[in-house]
């Protein structure tokens, strides 16, 4: 949506009967008002900040996946990688809104270290929480104020995904803290991620009898189809 200021310009001709009137439409690009172009707007800067944040999250989650594998958490590693790919999709959607050139931004980004998997899950959850509770709602509000309703809607939709990311990370962290990654209080079905073997019991086997992969490859059997 583009907003305009309307000015009426009168010009009296040589003949007293000849009065010409022009309606001059001028884009109203003042900060806080509806913008005619993304360039130079607060939303342009916010889109760039969000793009940078999503891009960095993608890399962090890839690093965290490698750490999870080192600790034997194959499923958690796969979830980090899946989420990294989802952050890439967010970044690409935001990047496509930009109109070229250079955009100068001032922003703070996480400069954390790669910790153990429990620490990484909690750090990732905190980042997702900030995005869906603070950053994206504020950026969407500004975008809507400036007339960029499509960008606002996309940011609000991304926030929905980030909320789910946080929940999953917190659930996985809780499983580690409670010793429930490979052990439950009741008999459940465990699936080997490598070959598909199914084991029923309170705890995943030390090694898969079908493919000989270690316990870290087992996950709870779930059917979402």
Q: How should each PLM-predicted stretch be described?
A:
Residues 5-11, 24:
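Short hydrophobic alpha-helical segments enriched in small aliphatic residues
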Residues 8, 18, 203-205:
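Cysteine-cluster motifs in flexible loop/terminal segments that predominantly coordinate metals
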Residues 10, 15, 54-58:
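Intrinsically disordered, low-complexity sequence elements enriched in Ser/Thr/Gly/Pro
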Residues 16-34:
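Short, Lys/Arg-enriched N-terminal segments with co-localized hydrophobic residues
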Residues 31-225:
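Non-heme di-metal
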């Amino acid at each position: 949506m583009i907003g305009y200021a309307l000015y009426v310009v009168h010009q009296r001709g040589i003949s007293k009967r000849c009065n010409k009137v022009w309606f001059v439409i001028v884009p109203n690009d003042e900060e806080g008002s509806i913008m005619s172009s993304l360039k130079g707007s607060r939303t342009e800067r916010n889109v760039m900040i969000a793009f940078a944040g999503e891009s960095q999250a993608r890399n962090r989650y890839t690093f965290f996946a490698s750490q999870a594998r080192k600790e034997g958490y194959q499923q958690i590693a796969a979830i980090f990688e899946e989420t990294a790919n989802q952050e890439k999709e967010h970044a690409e959607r935001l990047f496509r809104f930009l109109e070229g050139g250079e955009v100068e931004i001032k922003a703070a980004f996480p400069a954390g270290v790669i910790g153990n998997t429990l620490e990484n899950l909690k750090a990732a959850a905190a980042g997702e929480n900030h995005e869906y509770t603070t950053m994206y709602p504020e950026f969407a509000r500004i975008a809507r104020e400036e007339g960029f309703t499509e960008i606002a809607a996309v940011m609000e939709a991304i926030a929905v995904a980030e909320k789910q990311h946080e929940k999953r990370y917190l659930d996985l962290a809780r499983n580690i803290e409670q010793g429930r990654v490979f052990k439950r209080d009741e008999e459940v079905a465990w699936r080997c991620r490598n070959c598909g073997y199914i084991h029923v019991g309170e705890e995943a086997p030390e090694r898969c009898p079908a493919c000989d992969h270690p316990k870290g490859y087992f996950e709870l059997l779930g059917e979402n189809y």
